[in-house]
Amino acid sequence: MILQIDENAEEIYFPDPHYGDEDGCFAVGGDLSIDRLLLAYSNGIFPWYSFRDQPEILWFCPMKRFVIFPDEIHVSHSMRTLLRKNRYSVGINEDFDAVIRACSKTNGRYEEEGAWLGENIIQAFTALHEQGFAASVEVWDNETGELVGGLYGVTIGKVFIGESMFSKVPSGSKIALIFLARYLQEHGGKMIDCQLETPHLKSMGGRYISYEEYMEIMNED
């Protein structure tokens, strides 16, 4: 059941996500304000646009969550070889705007190229970033200085919720994800929420957990 959010309500709220459809969609409407996004992500909820049949924001909260635990990240032999070559440098929050705009120009989790990541969404996540609730990882080519890969997402407590990634070179986004996992290990991060399963993420250690386990980790001190 997908319920309409009452935009005239005195307080920001979401319906109970347990009654969503099989894909996890349970609500429509609302906005991308910082307060609503923080309420959403702290409860395992994320926004999604479907321009084909629904111009409003769709809100998803799957009861099975595809995640990567930082200490379970799988680094293949070929990736280890690539990383040892020191061809790329990796940083965090060095150019959030460049990363999110690069993601908007690639086919991500939606079919419409770039359409899902319009200027309104870029502005919303940039606002989260400016408040310390969104972060980016950048992969730079050491020879050319070009940004060749990266990812961005929302940070809530010890959880990183991945939103999108891009790669202009083979394995560029994998390098970013490996760096993120190692960074979280060093700084007490507990989990990377991948949102959707892909062969790419599964090969790197992604697996499903229940929504209940997800929220237990989300609420850890």
Annotate each language-model stretch with its function.
Residues 1-221:
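N-acyltransferase acceptor-side catalytic subdomain
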